Amino acid sequence: MVIGLVIFVSVAATIVGVLSNVLDMIMYVEENNEEDAKIKEEQELLLLY
C-alpha cells in the first residue's frame, strides 16, 4: 500500500517535471521566433534605406 503510493507520487512528479520542461521549451522557441522576426524586419528596413 505505502510502496504503491510512493511509486505513484514519484511517477506523478516525473510527469509534471517533463511537462514543465516541454512547456519551457515551447515558450523559449516562441520567444526566439518573435526575436528572429523582429531582426528580419529591422534588416529589411535597413536595406530599404
Swiss-Prot record:
Ranges in the topological domain labelled Intravirion: 23-49
GO terms under cellular component: host cell membrane; membrane; virion membrane
Keywords: Host membrane, Late protein, Membrane, Signal-anchor, Transmembrane, Transmembrane helix, Virion
Positions in the Virion surface compartment: 1
Cell location: Virion membrane; Host membrane
Membrane topology, record value: Single-pass type II membrane protein
Transmembrane segments: 2-22
Keyword Transmembrane recorded: yes
Sequence similarity: Belongs to the orthopoxvirus OPG059 family.
Record function comment: May play a role in cell adhesion and is important for virus virulence in vivo, although it is not required for the virus life cycle in cell cultures.
This protein's name: Protein OPG059
